[in-house]
């Protein structure tokens, strides 16, 4: 059975993906502060500022990593650089959940998959920085998903 690791599986998007994929794949996830995940043996505590992702990956042995992480931008950039290096030298793949904010400068025009990214927001520029790092990988090694605004159940 294919093994999947969802980074940020305690968040809204990550947990929704975990619940959907768990029935079909050997699925693992990370959590930071959410209570109730510590007893789940498929969840690992992960503090992005302290690291420890390497040991989680060694234990989970994923063939696919889904990044739904959030946190301080610099720590996220370092974590994704680690993931890119890992994926470049293994048979693992990455799905990176980015944002439509990479196009927020073009608010009066539609944006398409292959359009040049340009953002006025700090968040959009941060996502562009990680996307540009991913472009150095072989295309078969990653999938880039640009999500629009996502609202929770009670929004």
Task: For each feature predicted by the language model, list its residue ranges.
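SDR active-site strand-loop-helix element
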Residues: 7, 30, 68, 94-99, ...
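Active-site Tyr-X1-5-Lys
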Residues: 118-143
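Short, hydrophobic beta-strand segments that form beta-sheet elements in well-ordered domains
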Residues: 4-6, 24-32, 65
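N-terminal Rossmann NAD(P)H-binding glycine-rich loop of SDR-like oxidoreductase domains
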Residues: 1-24
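Flexible, glycine-rich beta-alpha linker
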Residues: 145-155
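Rossmann-fold cofactor-recognition segment
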Residues: 32-51, 71
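NAD(P)-cofactor binding segment of oxidoreductase domains
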Residues: 56-95
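Conserved Rossmann-fold NAD(P)-dependent oxidoreductase catalytic core, especially the SDR/UDP-sugar
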Residues: 82-120
